[in-house]
Design a protein with these regions (language model features):
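Exoplasmic/lumenal beta-rich domain surfaces
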Residues: 1-57, 125-158
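Short, aromatic- and glycine-rich surface loops/edge beta-strands on solvent-exposed regions
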Residues: 62-66, 167-177
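Short, solvent-exposed loop/turn segments at the edges of extracellular beta-sandwich modules
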Residues: 67-78, 176-180
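C-terminal edge beta-strand
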Residues: 73-93, 186-191
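Proline-enriched interdomain boundary motifs that mark the N-terminal boundary
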Residues: 93-100, 195-200
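Short, solvent-exposed loop/linker segments at the N-terminal edge
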Residues: 103-110
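A short beta-strand segment in extracellular, disulfide-stabilized domains
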Residues: 111-115
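Short amphipathic, basic-aromatic surface patches that mediate peripheral association
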Residues: 117-123
Length: 201
């Protein structure tokens, strides 16, 4: 009993080959579920106490549950639906953005280079052949702006800075042709980017 209590307080470990690594969360209006939470991802913390990205090869099984509260049924009897998904995790080199990796100012209309370490994501097991490059203007919480679509997963891409001014931009590279984007293969820059108009500098 004492050992179990200590284990529960410690939380899951990235080296676990079996057992749960992520927790259930309350319903949300968001169409995306970040694992771990997006606030952890953008601070480069993929192993917070209760949601841990695995560092070893393993299988993970997920259950997505939708439940209504029965408001449209007699006596308030609700309905549920479940979708199951299994994911294979590869113990391989990380998929990470290399540049930008420091705070920098980019001018609207300029062409900038994004580079990333492909790791082993382009091998036959993971088979990520193309990526999307997206831009966040709110510090990495959302990535609504598509800078490049279905570009080869070759580690670099020149992108044009859109006509948007912000002091808290981030860049994300995500797989375009597999499920992977930290649980999906995705990586966001750790740098804080400032998008400015050179005419104002």
């Amino acid at each position: 009993m004492i050992l179990r209590m200590l284990e529960e307080e410690r939380g899951p470990q990235s080296t676990w080959a079996v057992g749960p690594l992520y927790r259930s969360r309350f319903p949300s209006t968001s169409l995306n579920r970040w694992m771990p939470q997006i606030s952890n991802v953008i601070s480069n913390d993929l192993t917070p106490t209760w949601e841990v990205t695995p560092s070893v090869s393993r299988q993970m099984s997920f259950s997505f549950i939708v439940r209504d509260n029965g408001s449209g049924f007699a006596n308030g009897i609700g309905q549920t639906s479940t979708d199951l998904m299994d994911i294979s995790v590869e113990d391989s080199d990380p998929f990470v953005i290399l540049t930008p990796n420091t705070d920098v100012i980019w001018n609207v209309g300029s062409t900038e280079m994004i580079s990333w370490d492909v790791g082993q994501t382009d091998n036959t097991t993971i088979n990520c052949q193309t990526v999307n490059i997206k831009l966040s203007t709110d510090g990495g919480m959302t990535y609504p702006i598509l800078l490049s679509s279905n570009t080869p997963n070759d580690g670099s891409e020149a992108i044009m800075i859109p006509n948007i001014l912000t002091t808290s931009a981030r860049v994300m590279v995500e797989a375009a042709d597999t499920i992977e984007t930290a649980l999906d293969i995705s990586c966001s820059s750790s740098a804080n980017l400032i998008l400015d108009d050179f005419r104002r500098l």
